[in-house]
Amino acid sequence: MSEKSDSNDDKSRTRSVVYVYSPEYIQTCDSLSKVPNRASMVHSLIEAYGLLKYMRVVKPHVASIEEMAVFHTDSYLQHLHKISQDGDNDDPQSADFGLGYDCPVVEGIFDYAAAVGGATLTAAQNLLDGKCDVAINWAGGWHHAKKDEASGSCYVNDAVLGILKLREKYDRVLYVDVDLHHGDGVEDAFSFTSKVMTVSLHKFSPGFFPGTGDVTDTGLGKGRWYAVNVPFEDGVRDDRYCQTFTSVMQEVKALFNPEAVVMQLGADTMAGDPMCSFNMTPVGVAKCLTYILGWELPTLLLGGGGYNLANTARCWTYLTGTVLGQTLSSEIPDHEFFTEYGPDYSLEISPSCRPDRNESQHLERVISTIKGNLKNVV
């Protein structure tokens, strides 16, 4: 699986990269019922490909209530802490905080939220301290959580915490979200400010969660024009996605001129994901990532969605190789989860034959609208 941008190889090989990891952190993240053992699968494949030796592995700290309260309300955090200890699914207040249905209450869920929040804060702090050019937390990227409620399997919005940490040093921070779902929690958090621009490329369709993120959603008040949304229909493939991404990001860079970047790389866009929506491969996402890395700004990389666990591990391992300028063998190395990659035991993900519902003329209109909106950025 060797398709990489040659022009970026020299830069990527000299890039300083921090990888946030500890056995305890991975074990905690493995407990999330939506993606059981996914954190272990991702880390094990990265390790099996020998990529750890090219990065500085940093143990994450666990976020305190005070650190999470920089964004989340005390009442939400205190309630999450209380029910986490009890494992109480019947607390009548839980529904007010978005807990239940898609964010089930399980024992230890507060510890999970604190672990993820702390890991992203650890990554951001390493960027602030100049200890790396890129920091990675693949178990982070939970972009739906609101300040006072859980949402969409997200109990803490670690992406928002990471952005706020970077804002301690960098005046303008750009958030880029290529998850299948609209990054609504992050957009909402910064919808009234011109200091953080949010760019989300996602599926936008009636009845599809979270139901927000049309091209006309552009922010509010002082933050108007600082939210950029790129809606896609089902079936989009690498080429069309990357062309759209590049057209939008070129304009964003020129007009917003960010000083740091947070990029959420949810892998539920992959062909073969149970969401059965987009038709992408790691090669396409890597092209988007390479474009951002070419700006040579402090960059925080986060995970997100991805419900075909093997494909998610394939994707994030390939992206880790991209960051490091390492070409990875197509053959999955022998390791603890080797049997999960059958029947072909290959790193590649092939697109399916499903149709692309995105018409070129429609996407051109979307891009034109976005470029017109961005002209209002001052």
From Swiss-Prot:
Its cofactor is a divalent metal cation. Belongs to the histone deacetylase family. HD type 1 subfamily. A divalent metal cation binds at D179, H181, D268. The keyword Transferase does not apply. Keywords: Chromatin regulator, Chromosome, Cytoplasm, Hydrolase, Metal-binding, Nucleus, Repressor, Transcription, Transcription regulation. It is found in: Nucleus; Chromosome; Cytoplasm. Its activity is inhibited by trichostatin A (TSA) and butyrate, 2 well known histone deacetylase inhibitors. Its main location: nucleus. This is Histone deacetylase 8. It comes from Danio rerio (Zebrafish). It catalyses: N(6)-acetyl-L-lysyl-[histone] + H2O = L-lysyl-[histone] + acetate; N(6)-acetyl-L-lysyl-[protein] + H2O = L-lysyl-[protein] + acetate; N(6)-(2E)-butenoyl-L-lysyl-[protein] + H2O = (2E)-2-butenoate + L-lysyl-[protein]. CDD domains: HDAC8 (cd10000). GO terms for biological process: central nervous system development; heterochromatin formation; neuron cellular homeostasis. Histone deacetylase that catalyzes the deacetylation of lysine residues on the N-terminal part of the core histones (H2A, H2B, H3 and H4). Histone deacetylation gives a tag for epigenetic repression and plays an important role in transcriptional regulation, cell cycle progression and developmental events. Histone deacetylases act via the formation of large multiprotein complexes. Also involved in the deacetylation of non-histone proteins. Substrate binds at D102, G152, Y307. Residues 15-325 are annotated as: Histone deacetylase. The keyword Metal-binding applies. Signal peptide: none annotated. PANTHER family: HISTONE DEACETYLASE 8, HISTONE DEACETYLASE HDAC1-RELATED. Binds 1 divalent metal cation per subunit. GO terms for cellular component: chromosome; cytoplasm; nucleus. Its EC number is 3.5.1.98, 3.5.1.-. It is an enzyme of class 3 (hydrolase).
